[in-house]
């Protein structure tokens, strides 16, 4: 089978289904691909294809995830669905599947359940920016008032976690009936697709964001000055641009006097490229791995933050024993480890391998960070956890 050509013409948006176990996330995923393929063309994915999710390893963590793709007339969607609750937790914390928006699936027969709440909270913590709700199994509820009540409950729950519960789209449908080809329910899947198109804004591309380059290596070239190398994380840097060197110590400024790639001089370095940047007036000893080169004013160094964390299980190669208050592992940000002290939440005495929780971290050196930045927790070079900066404190 020939590979279909990847069409760059349409905006590419990443979404995923979240919600309580057995509320119909995978059935909905199958229904979306099936109904959209029938309506707009494209390939359908069967339920058992999606449900039989392959295991992937992201930063040493085993996650089962299914990836499907579908098109609306204006967009191309990449959609992730996870079989188990633990997979969602890991996926959202590691950022293995970054979501521009999420489809929260709530069964009308049950209303919001514990994992519904947990997924909304996780979405808030890890920075899923937009939620669209699909109320599933509405064919099994005859009472119109009951449907309204469930919708109200879901909206209130979303508002509680600072999503705009009153304004976001809620579609009442039945994934199973749509999958079986019943027209009135197929129409609800189209309505959901239209809600994704109109409610989730087109994501800002990495290249359009402010320039940032995590420094991997520093060289001194006699007669030319100091060169830092790394992969541009976002934005574009042009020869002549002023930059800040942020993290580890006090922020300094410099000017990029040259950009090289594969020993060739270029005018610019763009997101995704491995480059060397020549810095004017910067000494070799002033720069180190772990700092970032960034557009002035675009990012600040911080030492204290609230983290949402998943602690690896023993089977994943994590710790075999719990940790307690006073735990001081290394936090690996981008290119380097920084030691940090962990402050456990009130009432939590110990943390077991396989747990997920939030706690406050105080680093011994500042790191350039924004909320949403991912990190690994390591002990002597071995990964024992994964986390995301949920809230910067200082």
Curated annotation (Swiss-Prot):
Residue numbers spanned by region G1: 19-26
Binding site for GTP: 19-26, 81-85, 136-139
Chain intervals for the UniProt region annotation (G4): 136-139
Domain tr-type G: 10-204
Annotated region described as G2, given as residue ranges: 60-64
Designated name of the protein: Elongation factor Tu
Catalytic class of the enzyme: hydrolase
GO cellular component, one term: cytosol
Stretches the record annotates as G5: 174-176
Record family assignment: Belongs to the TRAFAC class translation factor GTPase superfamily. Classic translation factor GTPase family. EF-Tu/EF-1A subfamily.
Lineage, highest ranks first: Bacteria, Pseudomonadati, Pseudomonadota, Gammaproteobacteria, Alteromonadales
Enzyme Commission number: 3.6.5.3
Residues the entry annotates as binding Mg(2+): 26
MF GO annotations: GTP binding; GTPase activity; guanosine tetraphosphate binding; translation elongation factor activity
Domain of life: Bacteria
InterPro entries the UniProt entry points to: EF-Tu_GTP-bd, EF-Tu_GTPase, EFTu-like_2, EFTU_2, G_TR_CS, P-loop_NTPase, Small_GTP-bd, T_Tr_GTP-bd_dom
HAMAP family: EF_Tu_B
Subunit annotation: Monomer.
Keywords from the UniProt entry: Cytoplasm, Elongation factor, GTP-binding, Hydrolase, Magnesium, Metal-binding, Nucleotide-binding, Protein biosynthesis
Reactions catalysed according to its record: GTP + H2O = GDP + phosphate + H(+)
Purpose of the protein: GTP hydrolase that promotes the GTP-dependent binding of aminoacyl-tRNA to the A-site of ribosomes during protein biosynthesis.
Pfam families: GTP_EFTU (PF00009), GTP_EFTU_D2 (PF03144), GTP_EFTU_D3 (PF03143)
Organism: Pseudoalteromonas atlantica (strain T6c / ATCC BAA-1087)
Record Gene3D superfamilies: P-loop containing nucleotide triphosphate hydrolases (3.40.50.300), Translation factors (2.40.30.10)
